[in-house]
């Protein structure tokens, strides 16, 4: 981000997204084979769904709340209407107004290429539940007691903070540590690192662009040359990164 700008971010993302998708799918597949004594991905997925079907519902389950007039609240807000209604607002913002989505699209060599890139990125988003959400549900199922309840006694010690609260963010590291073969752990860890680095690089580059174009050039130096703006952009990246390092520990949890 500092020296290569958007071009460097784009090319590193190409490599990182391949590692992220392959590593995530591999981790999920291996975890599914261990979640049931029968083994197998399909059997594991069926076991997870049958054990905690409520974890596969967004906000409401069918039949969970019945309104006074006898209607199933699942078909009203919040429920399925969220998927066909409210979520479009959030997604219109993300794909149409998010700065680092826009800058990548505008950097395409043509309108057609930009449209293809957005469509492909949207397709990759559909894989996220498989490589992010599902491993968490698998870890949850593996730590239930015999009655199907998550308790401090049934949970692996790696999921308990010193204050006694559950460390939900430890699901992926726990799966990697306990179930991923030694030769594959490196790839999975690289996938997790790729997810962090990819997002960080994009956000830093976006921060640099916004500050340089919308603040520095617009209000402080309207006649700034391209070379000057590149320098300011690089300084902005470094400063933003230092600020992030300082405040990140305060945002834990």
Regions found by a protein language model. Give the residues of each.
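Membrane-embedded helix-loop-helix hairpins and adjacent transmembrane boundary segments
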Residues: 1-253
């Amino acid at each position: 981000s500092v020296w290569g700008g958007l071009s460097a971010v784009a090319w590193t993302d190409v490599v990182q997204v391949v590692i992220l998708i392959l590593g995530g799918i591999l981790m999920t597949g291996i975890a599914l084979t261990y979640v049931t004594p029968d083994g197998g991905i399909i059997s594991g997925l069926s076991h997870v769904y049958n054990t905690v079907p409520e974890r596969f519902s967004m906000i409401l389950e069918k039949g969970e709340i019945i309104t006074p007039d006898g209607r199933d609240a699942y078909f009203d807000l919040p429920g399925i209407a969220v998927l066909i209604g409210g979520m479009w607002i959030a997604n219109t913002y993300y794909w149409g107004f998010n700065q680092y989505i826009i800058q990548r699209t505008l950097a395409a060599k043509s309108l057609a290429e930009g449209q293809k890139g957005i469509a492909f990125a949207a397709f990759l988003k559909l894989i996220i539940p498989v490589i992010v959400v599902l491993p968490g549900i698998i870890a949850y199922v593996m730590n239930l007691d015999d009655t199907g309840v998550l308790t401090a006694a049934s949970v692996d010690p790696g999921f308990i903070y010193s204050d006694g609260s559950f460390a939900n963010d430890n699901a992926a590291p726990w799966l990697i540590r306990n179930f991923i073969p030694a030769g594959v752990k490196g790839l999975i860890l690289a996938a997790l690192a790729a997810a962090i680095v990819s997002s960080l690089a994009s956000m830093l580059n976006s921060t640099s662009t916004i500050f340089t174009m919308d603040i520095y050039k617009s209000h402080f130096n309207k006649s700034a040359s391209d070379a000057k703006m590149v320098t300011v952009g690089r300084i902005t990246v470094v400063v933003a990164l230092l600020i992030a390092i300082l405040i990140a520990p305060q945002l834990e949890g």
